[in-house]
Amino acid sequence: MTAQTSAVSVISAANRLVAKVGSSLVTNEGRGLDRAAVGHWAAQIAALHQQGKQVVLVSSGAIAEGMARLGWRKRPSAMHELQAAAAVGQMGLCQAYEAAFAEFGLRTAQILLTHEDLADRHRYLNARSTLFALLRLGVVPIVNENDTVVTDEIRFGDNDTLGALVTNLIEADALIILTDQRGLYEADPRRDPAARFVAHAQAGDAALEAMAGGAGSGVGTGGMLTKILAAKRAAHSGAHTVIASGRERNVLTRLAQGECIGTELRAVLPVWSARKQWLADHLRLRGRVVLDDGAVHALLHEGKSLLPIGVAEVQGEFERGDVVACVDMHGRECARGLINYSSADTRRILRQPSSQIARILGSMTDPELMHRDNLVVT
């Protein structure tokens, strides 16, 4: 792990921020919303607005509020009951934030997203345009996953990931992940009192992922590993990440003033174009193509397109234009991108030179399976 030192938080220079607030920071230990806590976050974000900063808030808490409104003491396991609780609770969550921000003369907007919204290029661009319009109008967007319609197979899984995707979507300067932990430790501090705190590191450092466990409260679903991976995602759009305790007094305003709180993960990874960022942010891939060593080298080190001659195997079913993963012979993903041929056609032309595509398929739409402009090395 490569550590860095910094006297001033990276948040102080950020003009556009995404702040993610976990369930435990807006609920009464999972039993409905904590209105005082909601007001506390609204006050801090209002202060950031006064400084000219644009803020998007990614907030959990809908299911916990729904359970309280429905009188449920135990979190249900059935998907349809969780979705019902989310639908009921989202009303309360929006009402609470609307009332809290109104105290400071600010309007709020509800944005509910699913993975399908961000996987579809047109819907992705529409969501992006809407968020930009809201920010220009001085509105505070409140973002959450659309739990009512999402399925297990296409869930973001946690709001840490959603926060990173929104960060990339709006090209934010920084992502702040607020949790019930101080930040990142080299081991779980609840099990190892001698665990050392990590104040500064580089987003995407493999050593961070290796040492991260599933630290987190019983209310939320996001452990430290999801936060580290979220920081890695955000870094590819140039955004720095801070993982800090939401229990710290006025944590957002103090970060904005330059105080170093929590773990700061600086963005040092190559910044991808908006299109390549969209490709990289796909959480659900339609299939995989297994590449030989020569093809892997061509993608990773020569910036080449993927040709059918370098494909050893096709896994899964997909159509032309789907996002497909490229993996090496050991199953490790090395790239992903838009495929030019269906899985059925790819199986027919794998291991063949591009000059044979028309003969085998009857016509050739593209000489490449994936053009280098439509793939991203991961």
From Swiss-Prot:
Keywords: Amino-acid biosynthesis, ATP-binding, Cytoplasm, Kinase, Nucleotide-binding, Proline biosynthesis, Transferase. Its main location: cytoplasm. The keyword Amino-acid biosynthesis applies. Its EC number is 2.7.2.11. Pathway: Amino-acid biosynthesis; L-proline biosynthesis; L-glutamate 5-semialdehyde from L-glutamate: step 1/2. It is found in: Cytoplasm. ATP binds at K20, T179, D180, T221, G222, G223, M224, L225, T226, K227. Gene3D superfamilies: Acetylglutamate kinase-like, PUA domain. GO terms for cellular component: cytosol. GO terms for molecular function: ATP binding; glutamate 5-kinase activity; RNA binding. Pfam families: AA_kinase (PF00696), PUA (PF01472). It catalyses: L-glutamate + ATP = L-glutamyl 5-phosphate + ADP. NCBIfam families: proB. This is Glutamate 5-kinase.
